[in-house]
């Protein structure tokens, strides 16, 4: 999303250094574009190829994100890279269309990230309600809203030139229109109104929503982990403690600290995962959107406050686009997609059979934690791969639980973000993606 663009021919480097710099820039930008294309194409191909990935409503949002990032890699990044390497904008009147695509695709990517965070929060905070109401139709409505907003704040203002700052007359009376140089550098100075309003819609409001949702998700996950840890400690305590043969009084037995350490490690890794999700997004896009709001307030002299030189601004632009190359790694590298990618790339034979173990945590009638596992044939695409599933005991509202006990919902809830898969211990993973509703008795609903 780079409406304020300029090329790097102002660096003032000697000819040889300038040529070397352009070569290095070309190599780096080519790798970035190719990695973005490869990652997002794999996500799209996996969803198209494997039916079980299409059966999950949450993957609709992941595929929408991949499409928006793929468009960034096809319609936006290559043309800016050409301008960076050539030192000028070589595509002439294509500038306005490119700017519109840039704003639309970047905004769609960010709004899809926001929708994913809301979807994940709803799935973990109200699993029964989520199972009933998050239908494919509801998902398509949310996706349509994200894309519609992206189009509305991009093509309409750009085509009507609402996004451009009004030309100013300098004190010497010599007027120079921004249009005079537009064919050479595609430099569009945004109006203050458009810069602030578009930044609010494209970034600041979505990032505020994401902070709230992921903070809430962490708190809910923390409660789940501590609840399971308490059940584990109770089971170990009951097993280790024996009664005396004489009077039957319980013998004092020491509490093991291993369960407390494991609980702390689980919470820490959940926090790390959520921090990576938010940290990558904010680090990539925040510098650009801060500068995007500052530049319209910059005066004619670059030494004034709010002014940013063209090279720094270009770096911020590419930082934002780099987020599109990282999204497939963060949001689509859960077990489901990893197996699909391995099959698509033909490298699943390199994976040992032990990696196909599926371990599930459940609670029996006595409230004890039970671990069960089975193995999948090597190379097969399983819905559940090498994960330990957290149980959201009493996460749903009491009203939802009553309806569930009355026989309302039959299917287990198998939804939470691919981005929220974290390691519990050295051998297994915990995934907030797979959450099965439980009743008051501690049993899974079936």
From Swiss-Prot:
Subunit structure: Interacts with DNAJC14 via its C-terminus PubMed:11331877. Interacts with DRD2. Interacts with DORIP1.
Record's bilayer topology term: Multi-pass membrane protein
Pfam families: 7tm_1
Domain of life according to the entry: Eukaryota
Name of the protein this chain belongs to: D(1A) dopamine receptor
Source organism per UniProt: Rattus norvegicus (Rat)
Regions that span the bilayer: 23-48, 60-86, 96-118, 138-162, 193-218, 273-299, 313-337
Compartments, record wording: Cell membrane; Endoplasmic reticulum membrane; Cell projection, Dendrite; Cell projection, Cilium membrane
Signal peptide: none
Disulfide cross-links: 95-186
Post-translational modification: N-glycosylated.
One cellular component term from this protein's GO annotations in UniProt: neuronal cell body
PROSITE patterns per the UniProt record, alphabetical: G_PROTEIN_RECEP_F1_1, G_PROTEIN_RECEP_F1_2
């Amino acid at each position: 999303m780079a409406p304020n663009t300029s090329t790097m021919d102002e660096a003032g480097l000697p000819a040889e250094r300038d040529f070397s710099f352009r070569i290095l820039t070309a190599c780096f930008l080519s790798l970035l574009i190719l990695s973005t294309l490869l990652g997002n194409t794999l996500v799209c191909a996996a969803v198209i190829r494997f039916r079980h990935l299409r059966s999950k409503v949450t993957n609709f949002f992941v595929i929408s994100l991949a499409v928006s990032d793929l468009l960034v890699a096809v319609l936006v990044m290559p043309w800016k890279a050409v301008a960076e390497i050539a030192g000028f904008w070589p595509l002439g009147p294509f500038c306005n269309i490119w700017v519109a695509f840039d704003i639309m695709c970047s905004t769609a990517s960010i709004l899809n990230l926001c929708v994913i965070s809301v979807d994940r929060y709803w799935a973990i905070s109200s699993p029964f309600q989520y199972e009933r109401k998050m239908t494919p139709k509801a998902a398509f409505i949310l996706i349509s809203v994200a894309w519609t907003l992206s189009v509305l704040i991009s093509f309409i203002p750009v085509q009507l030139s609402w996004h451009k700052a009004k030309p100013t007359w300098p004190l010497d009376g010599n007027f120079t229109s921004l249009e005079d140089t537009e064919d050479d550098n595609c430099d569009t100075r945004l109006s203050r109104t458009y810069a602030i309003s578009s930044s609010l819609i494209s970034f600041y409001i979505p990032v505020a929503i994401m902070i709230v949702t992921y903070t809430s998700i962490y708190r809910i996950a923390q409660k789940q982990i501590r609840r399971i840890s308490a059940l584990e400690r109770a089971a170990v305590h009951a097993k280790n403690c024996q009664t005396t043969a004489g009077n039957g009084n319980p013998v004092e037995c020491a509490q093991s600290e291993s369960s407390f350490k494991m609980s702390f490690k689980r919470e820490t890794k959940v926090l790390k995962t959520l921090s990576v999700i938010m940290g990558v997004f904010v680090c990539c896009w925040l510098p650009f959107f801060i500068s995007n709001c500052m530049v319209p307030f910059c005066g004619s002299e670059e030494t004034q406050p709010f002014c940013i030189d063209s090279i720094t601004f270009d770096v911020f632009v590419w930082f934002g686009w780099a987020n599109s190359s990282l999204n497939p790694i963060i949001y689509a590298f859960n077990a489901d997609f990893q197996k699909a990618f391995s099959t698509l790339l033909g490298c699943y034979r390199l994976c040992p059979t032990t990696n196909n173990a599926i371990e599930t945590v459940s609670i029996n009638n006595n409230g004890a934690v039970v671990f069960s596992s089975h193995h999948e044939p090597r190379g097969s695409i399983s819905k559940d791969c090498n994960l330990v599933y957290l149980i959201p005991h009493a996460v749903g509202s009491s009203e939802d639980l009553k309806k569930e006990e009355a026989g309302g919902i039959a299917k287990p809830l198998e939804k939470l973000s691919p981005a929220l898969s974290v390691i519990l211990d050295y051998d297994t993973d915990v995934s907030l993606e797979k959450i099965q509703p439980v009743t008051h008795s501690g049993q899974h609903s079936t």
